[in-house]
Amino acid sequence: MTTTIFFATDIHGSDICWNKFLNAGKFYGADQLILGGDMTGKAVVPFIHQGGPNYRVTLLEQVFEITNEDELTEMKKKVRSRGYYPYLTNPDEIKELEKDPEKVSAIFSQEVLKVVQQWMEIAEKKLAGTGMKVYCCPGNDDMDEVDDVIRESRTVVLAEGEVVDLPSGHEMIASGWSNRTPWNTHREEDEDQLAARYEAMISRLKNPQASIFN
């Protein structure tokens, strides 16, 4: 029996990429979906209230003046399609945030996890009745708290550090950890630690020759 697996990685918070990934299973006749890592985006984009229905948004160094609800909705979609997180705020809060990096970090985490939760719900709706599951291991850019959200899903399986038995009969090991980077990301470690991480998973495989190393 032939098994088709669709693999993608590094979607970095983009709603468009997540939805295309979920749709790819049916389009390509895949039996299972694997997302390799780096699910989440890298920045919050402030939507600064200017009074009434008006907001000012700076996206990729371009300033947009929003003047009505339809424009606001479209700009949110545009920001999300690029993997950033829209955050409605006001000039007073912006002044406070400029002096409080911890609060900025908290807002970023809040928005990231909110979107990951939305993605889990989208996956459950799109893949209901298909028999397909998503096997996912967050990457080095993804905060640890992402794992907790994925664990609650009935459709998206957290594969990090596990030996997963796929419906095809193959075993799969998976990890989103990387070697050291200049950016001190969430999941990185020295080469010998990475080797130990993979050796621990490999030692649990029944048939390494027919296994998937993700």
Where are these regions (language model features)?
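Short catalytic-loop micro-motif centered on adjacent basic/acidic residues
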Residues: 5-9, 135-136
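Short, flexible loop segments at the rims of nucleotide/cofactor-binding pockets, characterized by
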Residues: 8-13, 110-115, 187-190
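Core catalytic region of metal-dependent phosphoesterases/phosphodiesterases
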Residues: 15-167
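Short, structured patches in soluble enzyme cores that scaffold and shape functional sites
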Residues: 138, 174-176
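A short secondary-structure junction signal
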Residues: 146-149, 182-187
